[in-house]
């Protein structure tokens, strides 16, 4: 397993590489109690400041990184969904059952989608980063204003985010299970 300082450098480099490839704000979040904590943030070109900011705790049910963590961390997901879920915009999904259905679609797709649910003018996509134990330990995300991250580009951008997250997972010691 890489040392903690080496892991931090590896994560920072991976987020920067994704930002350079996409030209949009990218970040990496980890679970922190019932929230997602932004550990790495790299601002995109001409995007303006997009949340989450470095060291900011954000809700999981309405952010791309938070949804990716919820989708792949079942026990933690249930702890989060048992709590009251705040509404931040008219698009925020606060229903635990509808969120469970959305998270099942997230797992099937391979990345989460946040469409103006936390801030009314941004969208985000995120994919899980797995550790050597196979648990989703973080989520790598891209967030941008709606005019920069258009819904018809989700598939292409989502694939790029998933590839970056898979590469980071491998660097952190994750070996995907091989189907028999």
List each model region and its residues:
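Flexible, glycine/proline-enriched loop segments at strand-loop-helix junctions
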Residues: 2, 89-91
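Cysteine/selenocysteine-centered motifs that mediate thiol-based redox chemistry or coordinate metal-sulfur cofactors
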Residues: 79-87, 162-180
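Amphipathic alpha-helical effector-binding/dimerization core
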Residues: 1-83
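Solvent-exposed, charged/polar functional surfaces in cytosolic regulatory/catalytic domains
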Residues: 17, 21, 101-105, 167, ...
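Extended hydrophobic
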Residues: 92-165
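N-terminal helix-turn-helix
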Residues: 1-9, 159, 166-174
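Generic structural signal for secondary-structure transition and capping sites
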Residues: 23, 74, 85, 108-112, ...
């Amino acid at each position: 397993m890489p040392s903690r300082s080496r892991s931090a450098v590896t994560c920072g480099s991976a987020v920067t590489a994704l930002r350079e490839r996409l030209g949009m704000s990218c970040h990496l979040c980890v679970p922190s109690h019932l929230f997602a904590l932004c550990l790495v943030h790299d601002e995109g070109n001409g995007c303006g400041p997009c949340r989450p900011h470095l060291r900011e705790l954000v809700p999981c049910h309405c952010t791309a990184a938070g949804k990716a963590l919820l989708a792949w961390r079942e026990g933690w997901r249930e702890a989060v969904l048992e709590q009251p879920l705040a509404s931040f915009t008219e698009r925020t999904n606060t229903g635990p059952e509808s969120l469970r259905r959305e998270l099942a679609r997230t797992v099937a797709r391979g990345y989460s989608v946040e469409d103006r649910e936390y801030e009314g003018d941004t969208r985000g996509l995120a994919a899980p980063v797995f550790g050597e134990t196979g648990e989703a330990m973080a989520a790598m995300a891209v967030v941008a204003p709606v005019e920069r991250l258009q819904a018809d580009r989700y598939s292409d951008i989502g694939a790029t985010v998933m590839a970056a997250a898979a590469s980071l997972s491998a660097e952190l010691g994750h070996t995907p299970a091989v189907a028999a």
